[in-house]
Amino acid sequence: MTNTVITKWSQDMKFETMLPNGVSLMLGSSAEGDEKIPSPKVLMLSSLAVCSGLDVVSILEKMKIQLSDFKITSEANLTDEHPKYYNKVSLGYYFYGEDLDKEKINKAVNLSITKYCGVMEMFRSFAE
């Protein structure tokens, strides 16, 4: 499957990206002082968390595990030298609900990390 994303310079350090589903996103550099526009690297971390989260929720639903809430934190170290990239990434998984089966939750997270999350696989090529 091929995805096409069209990205157009908007102004200053801002770009508009049209996703394959027609949704438009504004991305750029926070150096311009506009904190409401995400940077490409921060969006990568968000994509990593969402990719894994989708896997985990899907797996837990199949295991009949009911969550009341679930969040993932992504923390990454950016290198000092150019090209700056994330060389270390850690994810924290937080589950909330009654009578949660920790063994099944750990299995779901492990399956996402080792087998299903394609974004995780891409991150493996450049980060610990």
Where are these regions (language model features)?
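Alpha-helical metal-binding/catalytic segments enriched in His/Glu/Asp
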Residues: 51
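Extended beta-strand/beta-hairpin segments
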Residues: 1-46, 57-128
